[in-house]
Amino acid sequence: MSRKDDNQSGEVGRTLVDFMEVAITMIVYLKGFYPSAAFERRRYMNVVVQRARHPELRDYIHSAASGLLPFIEKGLVERVAVVFFSEDNVPVERFIFKITIKPSCAALVEEGQLEFALRSFLIKLSVSKSLVKPLPLNCRWEVTAYLRSLPQVGSSKEAELWIPTDTKQWQNPPVLTPVKSLNSEPLCLQLYLEHPSLSEPLNLVNPEDVAPHDP
């Protein structure tokens, strides 16, 4: 890969990270996890979106999204999930972003074209209230990254921001609900919902994934 291709790949990664920060905020708003007054309307990519008012919430989302950048640039990120849990730490709903970036094609796309494509995801999210399920009482949520290989602790400051989680995993295949997909060069992106199947047992197993440190 040439230096120019590497720079272009970095631009794609930064655009994707900025988008992820906005999309995660919209998902949390969509779920009604916090009162609507905890958010304020802003415009991003010419779409009306939500921005967290509370500094700690805003910083957590920003840190989770921006912390993905070095791993996205290295092609390590396979999926990013916004996971909602019951009080027993059992996942009840996952918003999954499946990511593939083709660095060799990054120089072929203009930033405006990429933003236009990502804009359609934000528009779709804003009208997806009917797809989500009500949250249980005393629930919580987190951002989880599924990596193709785990970074070694101490290998970089970025790696230290992420820790393996003890999140329980469904044993049966989940119920999938597609939301939006993009299949282009250099970015392929899928957004879909996962819910546990009706036959899901109560005893769940732990996966190989990582989550950012709590703020």
Curated annotation (Swiss-Prot):
Disulfide bonds: none annotated. SUPFAM superfamilies: The spindle assembly checkpoint protein mad2. InterPro entries: HORMA_dom, HORMA_dom_sf, Mad2-like. Coiled coil: none annotated. One of its GO terms (biological process) is DNA repair. Belongs to the MAD2 family. Regulatory subunit of the error prone DNA polymerase zeta. Involved in damage-tolerance mechanisms through translesion DNA synthesis. This is DNA polymerase zeta processivity subunit. It comes from Arabidopsis thaliana (Mouse-ear cress).
